[in-house]
Amino acid sequence: MAEKKQWHETLHDQFGQYFAVDNVLYHEKTDHQDLIIFENAAFGRVMALDGVVQTTERDEFIYHEMMTHVPLLAHGHAKHVLIIGGGDGAMLREVTRHKNVESITMVEIDAGVVSFCRQYLPNHNADSYDDPRFKLVIDDGVNFVNQTSQTFDVIISDCTDPIGPGESLFTSAFYEGCKRCLNPSGIFVAQNGVCFLQQEEAIDSHRKLSHYFSDVGFYQAAIPTYYGGIMTFAWATDNDALRHLSTEIIQARFLASGLKCRYYNPAIHTAAFALPQYLQDALASQPS
């Protein structure tokens, strides 16, 4: 039997992961980054940008459920949602499940990602691009949040790692812009890497976000695709109570929403904010 081709992730120099490639569906350099979508027997369709896995069909539901339902149910009455990035459409898919949301704006820098994912990752977007509440804006996220006249109740930064096009979405200019267009008691969340291996990302985000928000923290989820353990999500708001809502309150909102999830549930919601001691210590050691 012929040996299968292997695709190796290039995020880390000294260690990493590989995927056997059963079939390359698409591989091109877009206007902004190198994009590949291939099939793997264990994880289904896999998308990578600039040598880093972004999503797989097998476990994407964990990431997208936690990035959407945690802030939306914590907020409780979000009407207007902004997604930065998210070109594969799965974040949009999860937001559209909240029937009380009135408008969903997605800002994606790379139109190529959107068009190719609509074709090759249909299970991710599940026709959510056709939702009448949805508006797509092709623009740089930093530019959008600093220029828009719109305001939002929840902002979800579905960014890549802080390299290439995603680097600007970890800057003070971006965080300041998000604060600018976030409504009172609004919530900002962002992908923040695997903290055991990328601890400096969390420390840097915490320091920068603390300049603009009174309550800054993190929550976590175990996502197999993201090598190294537990994925960390940044959380920022000026309503300190929202991070500490009881499981009972979240349970009532969850039941009222009618959501059916595969990973997220109210107990997971509240437990996700419990951080390992090494991360607590690292954050506490930083100058205020």
UniProtKB/Swiss-Prot annotation:
- The PABS domain extends over 9-238
Where in or outside the cell?
A: Cytoplasm
| InterPro entries named among the record's database cross-references | PABS (IPR030374), PABS_CS (IPR030373), SAM-dependent_MTases_sf (IPR029063), Spermi_synthase (IPR001045), Spermidine_synt_N (IPR035246), Spermidine_synt_N_sf (IPR037163)
The active-site annotation reads D158
Q: Kindly list the GO CC terms recorded for this protein.
A: cytosol
Q: Which UniProt keywords apply?
A: Cytoplasm, Polyamine biosynthesis, Spermidine biosynthesis, Transferase
Q: Which molecular function term from Gene Ontology is one that the record holds?
A: spermidine synthase activity
What reaction gets catalysed by this protein?
Answer: S-adenosyl 3-(methylsulfanyl)propylamine + putrescine = S-methyl-5'-thioadenosine + spermidine + H(+)
Q: Where does spermidine bind?
A: H64, D88, D158, C159, T160, D161
Binding sites annotated in the UniProt record for S-methyl-5'-thioadenosine? Q33, E108, D140, G141, P165
Give any single GO term for biological process: spermidine biosynthetic process
User: Which EC number(s) does UniProt give?
Assistant: 2.5.1.16
Pathway given for this chain reads: Amine and polyamine biosynthesis; spermidine biosynthesis; spermidine from putrescine: step 1/1
Please give the family membership noted in the entry: Belongs to the spermidine/spermine synthase family.
The entry's function note states: Catalyzes the irreversible transfer of a propylamine group from the amino donor S-adenosylmethioninamine (decarboxy-AdoMet) to putrescine (1,4-diaminobutane) to yield spermidine.
- Subunit description: Homodimer or homotetramer.
Protein name per Swiss-Prot or TrEMBL: Polyamine aminopropyltransferase
Q: Which organism is it from?
A: Shigella boydii serotype 4 (strain Sb227)
